[in-house]
């Protein structure tokens, strides 16, 4: 295991329902990456954008080499093949770790999954398969998974994927809510990179914002 190295995987919704939030998503992502460039330790970043299909924007790139995302990278379109994006990313990262030298496997692996709607387009993976994959990686290797959802019951949806209620949160799907998401996720990543426990209150600010501005 390689100490002080963290594998970070972002799975970001770019389906048509994200229309109007492109600038906020791009700005929030870039701000988060800049914060992580300044953090202690090393990090490899993978970014998967999904609609009907998944597009890998970054494949295990050193965080310090990530260039700012632009509107050429992030363009909304299509439906929501969330399960295919999650399953494909877990399969890829898992295989990389499986065949790597033990001393090269990152000390920490963390997934940040963001979606603003229900799964409606996957054809390679179903919720049962993804749940099996996530539960295995959590139990055997200690991987962390955060699930941020809008316009759905995020906790219930995450539970179908094997992600606990303490790692799932509903957010307000607007400019302010999107910006807050990236701030909070960056804080959570920093905790994991420092080997600090990721407490259930990591999502407190998002919870409070959601309840204050129209959530139930």
Regions found by a protein language model. Give the residues of each.
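Acidic, low-complexity intrinsically disordered regions
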Residues: 1-216
């Amino acid at each position: 295991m390689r100490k002080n190295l963290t594998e970070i995987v972002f799975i970001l919704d770019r389906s048509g329902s994200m229309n109007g939030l492109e600038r906020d998503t791009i700005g929030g992502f870039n701000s988060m990456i800049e914060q992580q460039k300044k953090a202690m330790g090393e990090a490899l970043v993978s970014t998967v954008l999904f609609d009907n299909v998944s597009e890998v924007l970054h494949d295990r790139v050193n965080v310090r080499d990530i260039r700012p995302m632009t509107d050429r990278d992030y363009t909304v379109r299509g439906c929501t093949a969330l399960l295919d994006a999650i399953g494909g990313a877990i399969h890829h990262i898992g295989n990389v770790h499986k065949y790597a030298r033990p001393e090269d496997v990152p000390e920490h692996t963390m997934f940040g999954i963001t979606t603003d709607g229900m799964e409606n387009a996957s054809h390679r993976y179903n919720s049962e398969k993804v749940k099996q994959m996530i539960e295995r990686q959590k139990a055997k290797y200690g991987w962390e998974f955060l699930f941020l959802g809008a316009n759905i019951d995020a906790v219930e949806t995450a539970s179908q994927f094997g992600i606990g209620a303490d790692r799932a949160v509903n957010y307000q799907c607007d400019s302010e809510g999107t910006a807050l998401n990236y701030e909070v996720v960056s804080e959570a990543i920093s905790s994991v990179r420092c080997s600090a426990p990721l407490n259930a209150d990591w999502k407190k600010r998002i919870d409070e914002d959601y309840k204050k501005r129209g959530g139930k």
